[in-house]
Amino acid sequence: MSILFYVMFLAYLRGVQGNSMDQRSLPEDSLNSLIIKLIQADILKNKLSKQMVDVKENYQSTLPKAEAPPREPAKSEFQPVTAMGPELLRQQRRYSSPRVLLSDSTPLEPPPLYLMEDYVGSPVAANRTSRRKRYAEHKSHRGEYSVCDSESLWVTDKSSAIDIRGHQVTVLGEIKTGNSPVKQYFYETRCKEARPVKNGCRGIDDKHWNSQCKTSQTYVRALTSENNKLVGWRWIRIDTSCVCALSRKIGRT
C-alpha cells in the first residue's frame, strides 16, 4: 500500500513540475532512481517488521507457561466404612425411593403408592389378618384377572445385590445413628408361580404362543458398600413386578 502511495505521489510531482515553467524538470534517470530507492526502502521496512514479529513470538514460546492452580479433589459420594456419618442419611431425601425404607422398626403396611398390590403382611400379630386381607382385595371389578399372579412384601434381610455396573455389592442391613440404629427395608414384588394355569400365563392363546410369568427387576438407590470399603448410595436391582413373557411357537403364523 505504501509503495503505491509513493508512486502516485511522484507521478503527481512530475505533473506539477511539467506544468511549471519556472522550474526545471528532473532528469528521467534520476527520477527512476528515486522511485527504485523508495521501493527498496519500503520492502526493507516490511521485512524488518516481519522479523521483529517472529522474534517476539519465538521469545514468548520459550517462556515457561504459568501453571494452573491445582484442582481441589471432587467430593466423593462414598465414604469409608469407619467414617460413615449422618450425611449419608441426610441424602436419603435426594435418593429416596418408595420401595426403600430406613426405619428403626419393621414396616407393617405397604408404601402409599403400592396400597393396591397383593401385599403379604408380617404374620407376627394375629390381629393384622384383616389388614392383610384388605390390601389383597384390590380387584375392584368382577371378571377381571391378571395374566400373572404376584405378591409384594417387605424384604428385611437383604444382604447383597447387583449394582448398575454389574458388580456385586453389600447391602447395609443396619446403620448406626446415635442411640437407635436403623435398618434398611426393601418393598419387592415377584411372581407367585411361573405358570398360573397349565399352559402358562392366564388368558394367552397357547395354540400360537408359549408363555411364562417372570419376575422383572428395576433399579433403586440403596445404602451399600463395595468390598467393605466405601459406603454410599448406589443403584441396585430389586424385584419390582411380574410380567408375562411370550414367544411364538415354531411353525405357527
Swiss-Prot record:
Propeptide residues per the UniProt entry: 19-134
Gene3D superfamilies: Cystine-knot cytokines
A Pfam family recorded for this sequence: NTF3_N
GO MF: growth factor activity; nerve growth factor receptor binding
Gene: NTF3
SMART domains for this protein: NGF
Entry-listed glycosylation sites: 127
Main location: secreted
Gene Ontology terms: cellular component: axon; dendrite; extracellular space; synaptic vesicle
Disulfide cysteine pairs (residue numbers): 148-213, 191-242, 201-244
The protein's name in its UniProt record: Neurotrophin-3
GO biological process, one term: cell surface receptor protein tyrosine kinase signaling pathway
SUPFAM superfamilies: Cystine-knot cytokines
Organism ancestry: Eukaryota, Metazoa, Chordata, Craniata, Vertebrata
